[in-house]
Amino acid sequence: MEILKSMIDPKIVMAIVISFIVASILGPIIIPLLHKLKFGQNIRQEGPKSHLKKAGTPTIGGLIFIFATIITMFIMVGNPTDEAMIALYSFVGFGFVGFLDDLLKIIKKKNEGLTSGQKMILLLIVSGFLTWYAYKYIGTSINIPFLNGQINFGLFYIPFVMFYFAGVTNAVNLTDGLDGLATSVTVLVTTFLGIISYNLGHISLAIFCVALAGALLAFLRFNAFPARVFMGDTGSLALGGAVAMVALILKMPLILVLIGIIYVIETLSVILQVASFKLTGKRIFKMAPIHHHFEQLGWSETKIVSVFSIITVVFCFIAFASL
């Protein structure tokens, strides 16, 4: 009943509708502009050969749902709470790092943007401020799923949160490897976080979450196979920053292991692949991240996205049961 109540609240419904409409309007404006500016995606040669035909598809499309979410937030919440503003900062801050990375890839005309050092410094600046905020205003305790208890990290909270932001943003970035995959999964993740935020009384935060979900639903029309636009690192890092910060505000960073199970699997597949090859000279998967493994097995992009989305739904229900 609480879930149903949150989804029929007029503010929640309006936020979803407005962000969907705004993103639907922005898409046909931004996509042709990206074409005109020749902001096309460079495809990795070592990736699946079927992806080579995607070269030139406009990237940096994450701007569509970033702008739509921001516009909706300020329409629906004239004076957002501090927690909603810090979630927006995380969303835009990480997205800006991704934007710089995408821009350099386009300028260089190859799939290499910021150097690892440059990217690390920028991400540390963004996550460093967020970690300071979390330590000072959110507190150092986090909830443990299924156990109905908390653990206080004390000073260890600082390195934990820094590692957490790096892990979540990179995990979402790895998931963005198929048309519509990161978009579909994150629609479900942000919807879950919106429901929990609402039920815990964080109304501004809930509006941010569902506004993002509505914008992503509209973006999916342009990003689903065959994609007319890619979100780029602009979008994937922004999404990682958003879900990471919202879960942290709710003191539920560990819940992302459940609702973000696809992010976790994608990341683990890369770690295991690299470790196995370095230790034994053999690969566990045909290709990593794991969505490419299923492509090599003959699965269509649409099938992979559908299956991964269903898995996310199942784990969202498991996450509800854990609270």
Curated annotation (Swiss-Prot):
Its EC number is 2.7.8.13. Keywords: Cell cycle, Cell division, Cell membrane, Cell shape, Cell wall biogenesis/degradation, Magnesium, Membrane, Metal-binding, Peptidoglycan synthesis, Transferase, Transmembrane, Transmembrane helix. InterPro entries: Glycosyl_transferase_4, PNAcMuramoyl-5peptid_Trfase, PNAcMuramoyl-5peptid_Trfase_CS. The keyword Transmembrane applies. Its cofactor is Mg(2+). GO terms for molecular function: metal ion binding; phospho-N-acetylmuramoyl-pentapeptide-transferase activity; UDP-N-acetylmuramoyl-L-alanyl-D-glutamyl-meso-2,6-diaminopimelyl-D-alanyl-D-alanine:undecaprenyl-phosphate transferase activity. It is an enzyme of class 2 (transferase). It is a multi-pass membrane protein. GO terms for cellular component: plasma membrane. The chain crosses the membrane at residues 12-32, 58-78, 84-104, 120-140, 151-171, 177-197, 200-220, 229-250, 303-323. It comes from Clostridium perfringens (strain ATCC 13124 / DSM 756 / JCM 1290 / NCIMB 6125 / NCTC 8237 / Type A). Pfam families: Glycos_transf_4. Catalyzes the initial step of the lipid cycle reactions in the biosynthesis of the cell wall peptidoglycan: transfers peptidoglycan precursor phospho-MurNAc-pentapeptide from UDP-MurNAc-pentapeptide onto the lipid carrier undecaprenyl phosphate, yielding undecaprenyl-pyrophosphoryl-MurNAc-pentapeptide, known as lipid I. This is Phospho-N-acetylmuramoyl-pentapeptide-transferase. It catalyses: UDP-N-acetyl-alpha-D-muramoyl-L-alanyl-gamma-D-glutamyl-meso-2,6-diaminopimeloyl-D-alanyl-D-alanine + di-trans,octa-cis-undecaprenyl phosphate = di-trans,octa-cis-undecaprenyl diphospho-N-acetyl-alpha-D-muramoyl-L-alanyl-D-glutamyl-meso-2,6-diaminopimeloyl-D-alanyl-D-alanine + UMP. The keyword Lipoprotein does not apply. Pathway: Cell wall biogenesis; peptidoglycan biosynthesis. It is found in: Cell membrane. Belongs to the glycosyltransferase 4 family. MraY subfamily. PROSITE patterns: MRAY_2. GO terms for biological process: cell division; cell wall organization; peptidoglycan biosynthetic process; regulation of cell shape.
